[in-house]
């Protein structure tokens, strides 16, 4: 039996990892990241459900439906981090702990990337560690869920 079920959401253009701007995002593919996440989830005894979409409404719908089966959300909303009030409001409206992750350090990049609509409604944000950002985020959300009653 799994301790928790975590929803992992990848936003727009993350399906192009390994091809898109490797100087910023590295050579790792989304399949590589998903494989690492599945291995880590198994090692720590949690179940993960993984989805990627380039469409804001699809991500909002996935967040809305997560309250029925997930205890936490790990999200890299990609460019929607900086533009989507809809994703921010969806997270705010479901009362499920959420960790925001980014491969690159969004604060060392272009000025328009410095603002996150998601960070204020997330329990935390991890950025700048490449694919490790996802693994750190998964560990963080699970640790939070285990200890939130303390």
From Swiss-Prot:
Pathway: Metabolic intermediate biosynthesis; chorismate biosynthesis; chorismate from D-erythrose 4-phosphate and phosphoenolpyruvate: step 3/7. The keyword Cell inner membrane does not apply. The active site is at residues 25, 102. Pfam families: DHquinase_II. One of its GO terms (molecular function) is 3-dehydroquinate dehydratase activity. InterPro entries: DHquinase_II, DHquinase_II_CS, DHquinase_II_sf. Transmembrane segments: none annotated. Its EC number is 4.2.1.10. Signal peptide: none annotated. It catalyses: 3-dehydroquinate = 3-dehydroshikimate + H2O. Substrate binds at residues 76, 82, 89, 103-104, 113. The record marks 20 as: Transition state stabilizer. GO terms for biological process: amino acid biosynthetic process; aromatic amino acid family biosynthetic process; chorismate biosynthetic process; quinate catabolic process. Disulfide bonds: none annotated. Keywords: Amino-acid biosynthesis, Aromatic amino acid biosynthesis, Lyase. Homododecamer. Belongs to the type-II 3-dehydroquinase family. Catalyzes a trans-dehydration via an enolate intermediate. This is 3-dehydroquinate dehydratase. It comes from Trichodesmium erythraeum (strain IMS101). The lineage of its organism: Bacteria, Bacillati, Cyanobacteriota, Cyanophyceae, Oscillatoriophycideae.
């Amino acid at each position: 039996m799994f301790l928790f079920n975590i929803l992992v959401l990848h936003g727009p253009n993350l399906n192009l990892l390994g091809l898109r701007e490797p100087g910023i995002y590295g050579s790792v593919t989304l399949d590589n990241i998903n494989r690492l996440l599945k291995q880590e989830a198994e090692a720590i005894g949690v179940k993960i459900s993984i989805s990627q979409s380039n469409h804001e409404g699809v991500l909002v719908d996935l967040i809305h439906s997560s309250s029925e089966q997930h205890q936490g959300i790990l999200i890299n909303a990609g460019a929607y981090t900086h533009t989507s009030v809809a994703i921010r409001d969806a997270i705010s409206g479901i009362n499920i702990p959420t960790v925001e992750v980014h491969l690159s350090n969004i604060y060392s990049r272009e000025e328009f990337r410095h603002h996150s609509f998601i960070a204020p409604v997330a329990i935390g944000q991890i950025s700048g560690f490449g694919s490790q950002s996802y693994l750190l985020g998964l560990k963080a959300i699970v640790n939070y869920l285990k200890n939130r009653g303390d």
